[in-house]
């Protein structure tokens, strides 16, 4: 419930999104990375349209507190390839020290301990979310420690996990 409230309250929300562009992190390689970037773009656009501060870090590209077109441009220009998600999360945290939600988009092959360490780059009070892209997973939401884990197979699943799982 708090995650949704953070998404919907523009007076205090700042969504910070990090995208893992390492093809080996995903079932489906580069196509799955493109899906991850599409999910990040969808979340970023919703956040910006709701007049919330938004930061994205995707491999060699970043955008913070800017317009929708510039944010989409950064996402579109990002290269697919190995990335240090720990360093990327650190960059996102530095760009958005006031973030209320830190979100890492990754694949099912990224070890959970690495997800935890990456999201730990955000302040303690930041809501930590991992969006895992996996064509073989059960779509849904679960909680692992202080991390909310959203699992989707395709872009169409994103709205369902945000509204059905987080509100439940």
Task: Give the residues covered by each predicted segment.
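Exposed, interaction-prone extracellular/peripheral surfaces
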Residues: 1-168
């Amino acid at each position: 419930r708090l995650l949704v409230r953070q998404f919907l309250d523009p007076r205090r929300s700042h969504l910070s999104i990090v995208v893992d562009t390492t093809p080996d992190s995903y079932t489906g390689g580069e196509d799955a990375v493109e899906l991850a970037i599409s999910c990040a773009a969808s979340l970023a656009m919703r956040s910006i349209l709701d007049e919330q501060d938004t930061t994205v870090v995707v491999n060699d590209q970043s955008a913070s507190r800017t317009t929708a077109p510039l944010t989409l441009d950064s996402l579109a220009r990002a290269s697919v390839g190995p990335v240090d998600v720990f360093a990327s999360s650190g960059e996102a945290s530095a760009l958005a020290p006031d973030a209320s939600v830190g979100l890492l988009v990754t694949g099912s092959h990224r070890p959970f301990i690495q997800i935890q360490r990456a999201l730990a780059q955000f302040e303690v009070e930041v809501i930590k979310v991992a969006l895992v892209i996996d064509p073989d997973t059960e779509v849904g939401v679960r909680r692992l420690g202080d991390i909310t884990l959203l699992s989707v197979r395709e872009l169409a699943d994103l709205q369902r996990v945000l509204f059905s799982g987080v509100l439940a």
